[in-house]
Structure formats: structure tokens, C-alpha cells
A protein has these predicted regions:
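Short loop/turn segments immediately following the C-termini of beta-strands
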Residues: 84-86, 143-145, 153, 187, ...
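Beta-propeller domains
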Residues: 45, 69-76, 82-110, 150, ...
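Loop/turn-rich, solvent-exposed surfaces of beta-rich toroidal or solenoidal domains
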Residues: 262-264, 268-272, 291-336
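A short loop-to-beta-strand structural motif that recurs across blades of beta-propeller domains
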Residues: 95-98, 156-159, 207, 211-216, ...
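Surface-exposed loop/turn positions within WD40 beta-propeller blades
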Residues: 94, 103, 155, 164, ...
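Secretory targeting and sorting signals
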Residues: 2-30
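Surface-exposed loop and turn segments in beta-propeller and other repeat-based domains
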Residues: 35-57, 99-125, 157-180, 221-248, ...
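Beta-rich, blade/repeat-based domains predominating
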Residues: 53-77, 92, 114-138, 143-144, ...
Length: 375
């Protein structure tokens, strides 16, 4: 993701803050005096874990997942990261997932080629932030482009890899159209995988906003060493703002996270976080859901995860800040994770994941192509 340094939501976020009765000094105070219930308020340091650039030179790290249990070539406590760009920095052309240990050792978990997709996902390979790990299977969004621009992108697919990094299954069609982000809820022998789709009418609109972004729930069944199978697909969210962008590739619903059955969505284009109730079981779309929070410290929210205390953590595309929002919708803490460029940190942040035992927060820094830790 490479938002223009003058990304429009910078101004929009500030204006929304003023409209909510928050001045810039108030926002600074909120950052300095994090509420006692804040998760990120307990951390005061950031450090580099490792470069995310593998031997083939892939750039622009997106998805971040912490491995919960060892299986195959996946090792407990390690972090897997998907790359969206190739060595020429063309978006929608990255083909690798790297595995990084907490001490910074990096290896290639998977290098996905077009041949491995066997014609079931035309257009090439471009791995998004839609990265999940369920029952030992890695599922990653593939949203490829021929030249780094959304105008030449394809609908893509979800690529299913086993714990050794081998492509075993492809999920495509049935509403999967530009899979931009994902999250999952596991249960015994099954999982609900939520996928944000951002290519519904965006190419034809040629940069204009269309409200056709969707969130799909894929209900998957698992049986031994066989790849997961789709038991059903439900559209649980719809009507999200989306558009193509020459710098950001696309702007649309991005980060997803589930807590107690509620799906939280980073509605990037509208500069807000929304909540879809009963997402794991519902049979109909909730539209864009209810608004949890908007404006304030948000500035084009992208990556999203849920903190151990149940708060929603998002990172901005329009600046280098992380924002923590309580379950009641109050923005309880925020801080800069990157201040490079102008505006500070714009376009640097994307995927994030809570470290084991809540000991910190892993996040990717696209500006430096690194995995970092807030601790």
C-alpha cells in the first residue's frame, strides 16, 4: 500500500476530529495519556524484528499472522508475512510468504507461482493482507495485476497451502472478487473465514467511488490431511465504499477482526470502523453494519486486529499511527509507529497481529520492508 503522501483522508480525519469536539491538542493528549483500559498504552518501545524481503526481492509486506502451534514447517511463535509487490515494486505481483522467528531469523515458507495455481486463478500472483492460519492450513488472498495497477488486475482467488507451504486448493468465484483482507474463527473440524472483496465494479468506475464492497463468510470443513472444503458461502456485509487508486492500488474495506461473534471492519474509504453483529451465524447481509467509531485519530484505517482486552486496534494509511478503540466506540489510545515521509508515516503501515501472551504487537512497516514489534 502506497497512499499518496497528501492522502485526502489526512484532512478528512482532522476535520472529523474537530467536528467531534476534538482539537489537535486533545488528540495529542489522548496519545500521551492512554486510558487505563488501553492495551497499547502499556508498551513504550518499538524494535525491528527482521527484514521481510526474501531472496527474490519481493517487497511491500502485507498480511501478518502468528503461528499458534507447530506443524510441518510452521513453528509455534513464529510470524508469517505475505508480500504484495515484486522486486520491481509493482503492486499485485508479490508471490512469497516468509516465516520469521521472534529473534529475527527469516526463511521462505512459500513461493507461489502461476503454475502452482493450475489455471484456476488467472492473472498471475499478488498476495494480499488476507492471510489466515486455520487448523494448520494457510489461506492467503491472491489479487494479481499485470503491471502493478488495479486497471489490469483480476478477480483473484484464495490460495490454500498446507503446513509445508505447498498449494493444495484454490477457492475462486462465488463472490470472491479482489480478496483484500481476511480473518478466521476456528471451531472443531470447521472454521468461518471472512474475506473483504474490493473489485466489485471498481475497475469500470475508473477511480470513482462505488459502494459495492463485500464481506463474505466461507464456512469450511476440515478432515485429516485433506484440504478444507467449502460448505457454504454467505454475504454478511455489503455496500462498502471502494475505488481504484494509482498509488494505493485500491481503497476499500480492509482489516477484519472477530470478537464474540461480532465482525469489525476497517471501512477505509469512509474513515471509520464498523461492526457486523452475529457474523459467524447470520444468513443475510448486515450492509456496512453499525458505526463503532469514525474520524478522530482514524486516518484511512487499514490493518485491524483485536486486542486481548477486546478493544479494536487499527493502523492508518494516511499517517503512521495505531489507534485503539474500546468496545463502546471510544478511541482510548493512539501513537505513532512510523514517522517517515510527509505526512509522517503515510503509507507505511498495514498488517498487524498480537504477540503471544499479549506481550506486544507485531506489525509490518512497508516503508522499510520490515517486521517490527511494539513492546
Amino acid at each position: 500500500m502506497r497512499f499518496t503522501r497528501g492522502f485526502a483522508l489526512v484532512a478528512a480525519g482532522t476535520a472529523a476530529a474537530m467536528g467531534a469536539g476534538l482539537t489537535t491538542s486533545t488528540l495529542a493528549l489522548a496519545s500521551a495519556r492512554s486510558a487505563p483500559s488501553s492495551f497499547i498504552g502499556g508498551f513504550h518501545h518499538t524494535s525491528k524484528v527482521a527484514s521481510t524481503v526474501p531472496g527474490n526481492g519481493d517487497l511491500n509486506p502485507y498480511g501478518v499472522v502468528v503461528v499458534a502451534s507447530s506443524q510441518g514447517r510452521l513453528h509455534r511463535g513464529n510470524i508469517i508475512v505475505s508480500n504484495f509487490n515484486n522486486s520491481k515494486n509493482l503492486q499485485g505481483t508479490g508471490s512469497t510468504i516468509v516465516q520469521i522467528s521472534p529473534r529475527g531469523h527469516r526463511s521462505v515458507f512459500a513461493h507461489i507461482t502461476s503454475g502452482a495455481l493450475k489455471g484456476r486463478c488467472p492473472g498471475g500472483v499478488g498476495l494480499t493482507t488476507g492471510l489466515v492460519l486455520v487448523h494448520g492450513w494457510v489461506i492467503v488472498g491472491n489479487f494479481p495485476s499485470r503491471n502493478g495497477q488495479a486497471a489490469t488486475s483480476s478477480a483473484g482467488c484464495l490460495v490454500v497451502l498446507d503446513s509445508r507451504g505447498v498449494v493444495r486448493e484454490i477457492f475462486s468465484g462465488r463472490g470472491i472478487n479482489g480478496p483484500w483482507d481476511a480473518t478466521a474463527v476456528e471451531s472443531q473440524g470447521s472454521a468461518a473465514v471472512f474475506v473483504a472483496n474490493v473489485l466489485n465494479g471498481t475497475k469500470a468506475a475508473m477511480g470513482k467511488v462505488v459502494h459495492r464492497g463485500t464481506i463474505l463468510r466461507l464456512d469450511l470443513g476440515f478432515s485429516g490431511a485433506k484440504p478444507p472444503r467449502i460448505r457454504g458461502i454467505t454475504k454478511v456485509g455489503s455496500g462498502f465504499a471502494e475505488r481504484t487508486d494509482p498509488n494505493a492500488f485500491v481503497v476499500g474495506p480492509t482489516g477484519l477482526g472477530v470478537r464474540n461473534g461480532t465482525l469489525y471492519v476497517a471501512d477505509t474509504g469512509m474513515n471509520r470502523i464498523t461492526a457486523i453483529p452475529g457474523a459467524v451465524m447470520r444468513h443475510t447481509s448486515a450492509g456496512t453494519g453499525r458505526v463503532l467509531t469514525s474520524g478522530g485519530g482514524l486516518n484511512g484505517p487499514l490493518g485491524l486486529t483485536i486486542a486481548p482486552n477486546g478493544n479494536v486496534l487499527t493502523v492508518n494509511g494516511g499517517d503512521g499511527r495505531i489507534v485503539e478503540t474500546s468496545k463502546s466506540g471510544k478511541q482510548v489510545a493512539m501513537r505513532f509507529l512510523d514517522k517517515s515521509g510527509s505526512p509522517p508515516g503515510a503509507g507505511a503501515l498495514f498488517g498487524l497481529a498480537v504477540a503471544p501472551h499479549g506481550a506486544g504487537l507485531y506489525y509490518v512497516d512497508d516503508a522499510a520492508n520490515t517486521l517490527r514489534l511494539l513492546h
